[in-house]
């Protein structure tokens, strides 16, 4: 498997001007090939026509060949059945912020939105050997949303929605506007060999470095039997995140450069919803800092406070549910601030006195198993409501819902030689194989 360099975002280059003698939509049997119109013209109508002609026929192919760049100037739903969408080129989203804010598809979570929905069944989306894919034109969004978290209107470029038995592979997503990929209300989806890079070049956006919030690699939501393999993520936010009602998930061979790593959450934000994350395996993950951002954690779990305080996307809480039957194996750490932790006092209303609610969550974490975790932590102070924590492992569970049946085996996390504090913190947690509070 060949991946782009982890220290360079690369250059999205491609031909956006088509020869005038070449028709923009060519059909040969059940194969439809789209050539871009060029000159900034919208290629969505021709792509959708190709999908209608060849993407809903058994064995059909829709081909967007390299090295072309296709302008995506409007929201797009590609409904595929028993067919293939081959993206050798690059889908470049337009810079019309007003259009996207007002016209993107709405997502039933944190008032979010998406620009491209992929729906259907028994389909393949393939970027080919050169890893074609998406350029989200993200920098203009990073600058536009600076100073805010979860700013309304930033659309996700790839939204797998109401799909079954599908494979997405060999895709590169550069400069996503928001989360790069959302798998939502879908089942039996395989996502293999992805490269995601979100790099901020505007120093006024983030004083911490060349990263920006809400540029996750992939999030799962209300989905079952999802496989994520052979990913490289470089950005600064969650590489992989499991949102509510993500079940039977397998993640393997993921390399992360910068950010919080693998996230279970956030969960329990909505008081009228039950969030379940169950039967999850995370295996063979490597995490280390990037030039964009430090490596905040390797794997972490986050649930909202137990009272409904404020409104989503940055406020809320009081939701119910559980994370259960989780296995994290073969996690390699390099220069990680807080390698493993559980946080049950989540809120993004940073100016409010949230600490008073830190033991109110009834969200449950149980049957979590960690094996073969090694590398080094930095023991740098990490802010947590009401305290500063600096450990290899911190299990900060709620008094109302203690964490139970947690096991740790073959854990070897070294901290700096001049560090004299505790290595492990356990609050309201039962952890076998871990020297709690030592």
UniProtKB/Swiss-Prot annotation:
Transmembrane segments: none annotated. Induction: By rhamnose. It is an enzyme of class 3 (hydrolase). Keywords: Carbohydrate metabolism, Cell wall biogenesis/degradation, Disulfide bond, Glycoprotein, Glycosidase, Hydrolase, Polysaccharide degradation, Repeat, Secreted, Signal. SUPFAM superfamilies: Pectin lyase-like (SSF51126). Its EC number is 3.2.1.67. One of its GO terms (cellular component) is extracellular region. Residues 1-21 form the signal peptide. Pfam families: Glyco_hydro_28. The active site is at 237 (proton donor). PbH1 repeats lie at residues 186-222, 223-244, 246-266, 277-303, 323-344. Its main location: secreted. One of its GO terms (molecular function) is polygalacturonase activity. It comes from the Eukaryota. Glycans are attached at residues 28, 102, 111, 197, 245, 253, 279, 325, 353, 372, 388, 418. One of its GO terms (biological process) is pectin catabolic process. Coiled coil: none annotated. It is found in: Secreted. Belongs to the glycosyl hydrolase 28 family. PANTHER family: EXO-POLYGALACTURONASE, PUTATIVE-RELATED (PTHR31736:SF12), PTHR31736. Specific in hydrolyzing the terminal glycosidic bond of polygalacturonic acid and oligogalacturonates. This is Putative galacturan 1,4-alpha-galacturonidase A. The lineage of its organism: Eukaryota, Fungi, Dikarya, Ascomycota, Pezizomycotina.
């Amino acid at each position: 498997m060949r991946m782009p360099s982890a220290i360079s975002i690369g250059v999205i280059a491609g031909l956006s001007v088509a020869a005038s003698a070449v028709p923009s939509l060519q059909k040969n049997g059940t194969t439809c090939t789209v050539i871009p119109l060029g000159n900034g013209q919208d290629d969505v109508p021709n792509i959708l026509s190709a999908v209608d002609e060849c993407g809903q026929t058994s064995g059909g192919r829709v081909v967007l060949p390299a090295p072309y760049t296709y302008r995506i100037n409007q929201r797009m739903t590609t409904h595929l059945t028993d067919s293939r969408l081959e993206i050798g080129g690059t889908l470049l989203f337009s810079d019309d912020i007003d259009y996207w804010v007002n016209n993107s598809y709405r997502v039933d979570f944190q008032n979010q939105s998406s620009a491209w929905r992929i729906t259907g069944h028994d389909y393949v989306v393939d970027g080919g050997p050169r890893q074609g894919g998406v350029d989200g034109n993200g920098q203009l969004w990073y600058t536009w949303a600076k100073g805010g978290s979860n700013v309304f209107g930033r659309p996700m470029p790839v939204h797998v929605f109401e799909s079954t038995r599908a494979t997405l592979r060999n895709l590169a997503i550069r400069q996503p506007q928001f989360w790069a990929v959302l798998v939502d209300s879908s089942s039996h989806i395989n996502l293999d060999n992805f490269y995601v890079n979100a790099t901020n070049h505007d120093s006024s956006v983030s004083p911490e470095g060349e990263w920006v919030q809400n540029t996750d690699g992939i999030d799962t939501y209300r989905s079952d039997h999802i496989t994520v393999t052979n990913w490289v993520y470089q950005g600064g936010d969650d590489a992989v995140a499991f949102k509510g009602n993500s079940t039977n998930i397998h993640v393997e061979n993921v390399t992360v450069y910068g950010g919080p790593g693998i996230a279970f959450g956030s969960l329990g934000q909505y008081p009228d919803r039950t969030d379940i994350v169950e039967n999850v395996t995370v295996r063979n993950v490597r995490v280390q800092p990037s030039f964009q951002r430090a490596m905040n954690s390797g794997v972490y779990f986050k649930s909202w406070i137990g009272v409904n305080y404020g409104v989503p996307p940055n406020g809320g809480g009081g939701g119910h549910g559980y994370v259960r039957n989780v296995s994290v194996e073969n996690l390699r750490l390099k220069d990680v601030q807080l390698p493993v932790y559980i946080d049950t006092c989540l809120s993004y209303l940073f100016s409010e006195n949230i600490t008073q609610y830190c033991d109110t969550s009834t969200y449950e974490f149980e049957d979590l198993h960690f094996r073969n975790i090694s590398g080094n932590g930095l023991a740098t102070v990490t802010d947590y409501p009401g305290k500063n924590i600096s450990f290899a492992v911190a299990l900060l569970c709620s008094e109302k819902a203690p964490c139970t049946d947690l096991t740790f085996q073959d854990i070897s996390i070294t901290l700096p030689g001049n560090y004299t504090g505790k290595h492990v913190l356990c609050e309201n947690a039962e952890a076998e194989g871990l020297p709690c509070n030592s």
